[in-house]
C-alpha cells in the first residue's frame, strides 16, 4: 500500500474543503450570524493540517486500483467528519451523531434529514447543507483530479473508484481533461438553473440552495414543506433540471461535440426517459381525484417521479397520502435510480438493463443450449468483467439491505418505515414512506440506527465496494 500518496491526496481534500467552507462563512458574514466563527475555526484547522500534508510530495507515485479504492473511501470519510464540525461547534446540531448523519446525507446527495424544520436553522448552516450536495454530486475526487499533478495514467484509478455506474469511460484521451469537461458541464448547468430560478422571482439565497440541491440531486430543503410553497413555474423548472442532472454527462459531451447520432443511440437514456414518462402517466391517472384538474395531477406526478428516479428527494406534496399504486411506483423508482455517469444515485438504469439482458440471455440458452449469444449495450459487447461486477454488486446490495433492515428493526417502528428508510438511504433518495415521508424526518431513529443508515448512504454513494474494502485485512498490506 502506497500510504504516502494516500496521505498526500487527503491533504488536498482538507484544503479543498476549507476553500468550500468560505461559501457558508461569507454567508454568515452577510447575515451577521455567530455560526461564522464555527466555520472560521474549521477552515483554519483544515488548512493547518492540509497544507503541511500537500507540501510534502509523495516518495512513490505508483497508484493502482487498491490505492484508488482506499483513497476514495478515506477521502469521503475525512470530508464528512470535517464537514460535520461546524454543525456541532455552532450549536445548530449539537449532537455529534445527528450532525454526522446530516452531513453524510448532504455529501452523499441523499437528502434524508434529522431536522423537523430547516427554516429554523441559520442561513450559513442551511447553505452548507445544500452546498454539500453540490460538492458531492459530481464527486469531490473528480474535482481533485483537475488539480492533482499525478502522472503515468494513475488518475483513472481514482475516477473508477468514485464514479457511479458499472463502468467508466474517458471522454478525452487524458482522464484529467475528462474531469475538467465534466465539471464545466456541471457548472454550466448549475448556473443556467440559478438564472431560470431568479427569472421566476425566487430570492437569490433560495435560488442558490435550490440549485445546489437540484444539481447534486440531493434534496435538502430550507423550508419545512420542501418545494411545496414555491410557484408552479419554479416547480416546473426544478422538475426539468432534476431530470437533466439524472442524464449521463457523457451524453451532454457528445451533444456539445455534435455527435448527435451517438448520443441518441444510448439505450440507458432512452430507457430513462421512457420510465419517467410511463411512471408519471400511471401516477397521474391514479391520483387524478386528489387534485383540481388533470394538469395539476400531471405536474405533481412528473415532479415526484423526477425527484425520486433522480434520487433528488424534493417534494411538492405529501405523497405518503397517495394511493397504494402510486406509492408502490415511487418505491420501485427508488431502486431504479438515474443514469450512470450522472449525479443521481440508485442502482442505475444501466445496471438494470444489463441484468434484464442477462436474464433474457439465460432464457434463450435454455431453449438453445448450444447458441453463442453476447450481451450488448449500445451495439457494443459487454465484457465478462462488467457483467460479473454487476452481478456481485446486486448480491452485496441485497445483503446490505437485509442486514440494515434487521438492525434498525430493534427501534420497533413499522416495517414500511424500516424498509423505506434503508432503501432510500442506500439509494441516496431522501424521503421514505410512513413515519419518514415528506412531512417526517429521520430524527426518530436511535443513535445506532442513524449510524447504520449513515453507513448505507456512504456505501450507496460509493457504489458499495470502496467502503467495504476497508474492512479487508489484505487491503492494508504493503507492496
Walk through the language-model features, giving the residues of each.
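Membrane-proximal intracellular helices of multi-pass ion channels
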Residues: 1-479
Amino acid at each position: 500500500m502506497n500510504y504516502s500518496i494516500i496521505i498526500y491526496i487527503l491533504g488536498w481534500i482538507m484544503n479543498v474543503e476549507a476553500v468550500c467552507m468560505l461559501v457558508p462563512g461569507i454567508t454568515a458574514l452577510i447575515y451577521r450570524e455567530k455560526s461564522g466563527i464555527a466555520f472560521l475555526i474549521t477552515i483554519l484547522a483544515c488548512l493547518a493540517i492540509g497544507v503541511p500534508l500537500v507540501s510534502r510530495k509523495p516518495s512513490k507515485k505508483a497508484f493502482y486500483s487498491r490505492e484508488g479504492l482506499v483513497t476514495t473511501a478515506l477521502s469521503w470519510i475525512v470530508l464528512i467528519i470535517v464537514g460535520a464540525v461546524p454543525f456541532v461547534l455552532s450549536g445548530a446540531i449539537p449532537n455529534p451523531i445527528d450532525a454526522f448523519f446530516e452531513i453524510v446525507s448532504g455529501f452523499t446527495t441523499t437528502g434524508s434529514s434529522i431536522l423537523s424544520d430547516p427554516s429554523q436553522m441559520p442561513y450559513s448552516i442551511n447553505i452548507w447543507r445544500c452546498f454539500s450536495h453540490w460538492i458531492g454530486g459530481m464527486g469531490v475526487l473528480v474535482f481533485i483530479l483537475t488539480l492533482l499533478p499525478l502522472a503515468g495514467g494513475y488518475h483513472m484509478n481514482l475516477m473508477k473508484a468514485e464514479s457511479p455506474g458499472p463502468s467508466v469511460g474517458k471522454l478525452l484521451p487524458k482522464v484529467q481533461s475528462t474531469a475538467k469537461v465534466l465539471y464545466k458541464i456541471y457548472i454550466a448547468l448549475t448556473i443556467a438553473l440559478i438564472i431560470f430560478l431568479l427569472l421566476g422571482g425566487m430570492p437569490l439565497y433560495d435560488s442558490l440552495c435550490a440549485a445546489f440541491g437540484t444539481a447534486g440531486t440531493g434534496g435538502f430543503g430550507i423550508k419545512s414543506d420542501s418545494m411545496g410553497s414555491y410557484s408552479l413555474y419554479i416547480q416546473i423548472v426544478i422538475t426539468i433540471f432534476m431530470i437533466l442532472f439524472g442524464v449521463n454527462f457523457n451524453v451532454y459531451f457528445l451533444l456539445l461535440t455534435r455527435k448527435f447520432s451517438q448520443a441518441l443511440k444510448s439505450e440507458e437514456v432512452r430507457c430513462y426517459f421512457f420510465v419517467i414518462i410511463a411512471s408519471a402517466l400511471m401516477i397521474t391517472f391514479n391520483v387524478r381525484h386528489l387534485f383540481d384538474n388533470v394538469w395539476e395531477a400531471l405536474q405533481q406526478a412528473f415532479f415526484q417521479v423526477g425527484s425520486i428516479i433522480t434520487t433528488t428527494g424534493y417534494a411538492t406534496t405529501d405523497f405518503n397520502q397517495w394511493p397504494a399504486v402510486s406509492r408502490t411506483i415511487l418505491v420501485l423508482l427508488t431502486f431504479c435510480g438515474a443514469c450512470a455517469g450522472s449525479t443521481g444515485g440508485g442502482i442505475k438504469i444501466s445496471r438494470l438493463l444489463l441484468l434484464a439482458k442477462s436474464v433474457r440471455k439465460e432464457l434463450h440458452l435454455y431453449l438453445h443450449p448450444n447458441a453463442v449469444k453476447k450481451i450488448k449495450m449500445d451495439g457494443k459487447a459487454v465484457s465478462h468483467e462488467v457483467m460479473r461486477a454487476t452481478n456481485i454488486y446486486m448480491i452485496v446490495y441485497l445483503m446490505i439491505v437485509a442486514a440494515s433492515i434487521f438492525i434498525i428493526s430493534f427501534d420497533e417502528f413499522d416495517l414500511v418505515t424500516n424498509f423505506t428508510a434503508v432503501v432510500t438511504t442506500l439509494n441516496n433518495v431522501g424521503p421514505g414512506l410512513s413515519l419518514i415521508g415528506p412531512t417526517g424526518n429521520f430524527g426518530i431513529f436511535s443513535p445506532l440506527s442513524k449510524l447504520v443508515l449513515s453507513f448505507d448512504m456512504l456505501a450507496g454513494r460509493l457504489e458499495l465496494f470502496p467502503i467495504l474494502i476497508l474492512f479487508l485485512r489484505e487491503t492494508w498490506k504493503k507492496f
